[in-house]
C-alpha cells in the first residue's frame, strides 16, 4: 500500500478526559490534510459535522459509545449510539462490558452489543480491551462481536495499561476485521500491526506515523 492508502486506515484520535473543541478542530484539520479518519468524543460531533474541514474533505467521523469502561446500561449505550449517528458519526466504537464477560455472562454481553448494532445503520467496532483479558476471554469476546453482527473488533480504549500487540491482532483477525489501538505512535509499530492483520489503526499520533512513513508500497 502507499501512503495515501495507509492514511485511509488511520483513525486519528483525540479522546482524553480534558479534550477541548480546539483539540478536536486540530484533529479534524490533520485528518482532512492527510486523508485520515477522525475519532472524537460524541459531545463534539454536532460541531465537528458543521466544520468546512469535514463537509469539504469528506473526513470519516468516528465516535465512541460506553466509553471507556463499557459499564453503561444497554439502553444507555443504544441511546448513545443513536444520538451519535444522528449527530453525524459515520462509525462508532462501543466498549464491551468486560466485567460481565469475565463472569461468563456471555449472552448478556452479546445482547448488549447487538442492541447497539441493531440501533444504527453504520459500522460498529467492539472494543474488547485485550490487555485486561486472558486468552480464553479474548476468544469469547471475539465470539460476542461475531454473534452480535458487529463489523470490527478493536483491541483497546487506550485507558487501560498496555495496548495492541501483534499476537493479539493475529488472533482477533481470524474472527473479524481488527482496529489496533493503544500505544501505536510510530510508523514501524503501525506497519507491524497491519502486517499482523489489522485493517485499521487507532492512534493520536496519526500525523507522526504518516510523516515517518516512506512513500513506498509494501505487502
UniProtKB/Swiss-Prot annotation:
Top EC class, one word: lyase
EC numbers, comma separated: 4.1.2.4
Subcellular localization: Cytoplasm
Entries under InterPro entries matching the protein: Aldolase_TIM, DeoC, DeoC/FbaB/LacD_aldolase, DeoC_typeI
Pathway noted in the entry: Carbohydrate degradation; 2-deoxy-D-ribose 1-phosphate degradation; D-glyceraldehyde 3-phosphate and acetaldehyde from 2-deoxy-alpha-D-ribose 1-phosphate: step 2/2
One example of a Gene Ontology biological process annotation: carbohydrate catabolic process
GO molecular function: deoxyribose-phosphate aldolase activity
Record's keyword annotation contains Lyase: yes
GO CC aspect terms: cytoplasm
Catalytic activity reported: 2-deoxy-D-ribose 5-phosphate = D-glyceraldehyde 3-phosphate + acetaldehyde
Keywords of this entry: Cytoplasm, Lyase, Schiff base
Active site residues of this protein: 93 (proton donor/acceptor), 154 (schiff-base intermediate with acetaldehyde), 179 (proton donor/acceptor)
Gene3D superfamilies assigned: Aldolase class I (3.20.20.70)
Name the UniProt record assigns to this protein: Deoxyribose-phosphate aldolase
Gene it is expressed from: deoC
Amino acid at each position: 500500500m502507499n501512503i495515501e492508502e495507509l492514511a485511509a486506515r488511520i483513525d486519528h484520535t483525540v479522546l482524553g478526559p480534558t479534550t477541548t473543541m480546539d483539540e478536536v478542530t486540530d484533529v479534524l484539520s490533520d485528518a482532512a490534510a492527510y486523508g485520515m479518519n477522525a475519532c472524537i468524543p460524541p459531545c463534539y460531533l454536532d460541531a465537528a459535522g458543521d466544520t468546512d474541514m469535514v463537509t469539504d474533505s469528506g473526513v470519516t467521523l468516528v465516535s465512541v459509545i460506553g466509553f471507556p469502561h463499557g459499564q453503561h446500561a444497554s439502553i444507555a449505550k443504544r441511546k448513545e449510539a443513536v444520538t451519535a449517528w444522528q449527530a453525524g458519526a459515520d462509525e462508532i466504537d462501543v466498549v464491551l462490558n468486560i466485567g460481565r464477560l469475565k463472569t461468563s455472562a456471555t449472552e448478556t454481553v452479546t445482547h448488549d452489543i447487538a442492541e447497539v448494532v441493531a440501533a444504527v445503520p453504520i459500522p460498529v467496532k467492539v472494543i474488547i480491551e485485550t490487555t485486561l483479558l486472558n486468552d480464553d476471554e479474548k476468544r469469547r469476546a471475539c465470539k460476542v462481536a461475531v454473534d452480535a453482527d458487529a463489523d470490527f473488533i478493536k483491541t483497546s480504549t487506550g485507558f487501560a495499561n498496555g495496548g495492541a500487540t501483534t499476537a493479539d491482532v493475529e488472533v482477533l483477525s481470524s474472527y473479524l476485521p481488527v482496529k489496533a489501538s493503544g500505544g501505536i505512535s510510530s510508523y514501524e509499530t503501525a506497519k507491524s500491526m497491519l502486517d499482523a492483520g489489522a485493517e485499521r489503526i487507532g492512534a493520536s499520533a496519526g500525523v507522526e506515523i504518516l510523516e515517518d512513513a516512506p512513500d513506498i508500497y509494501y505487502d
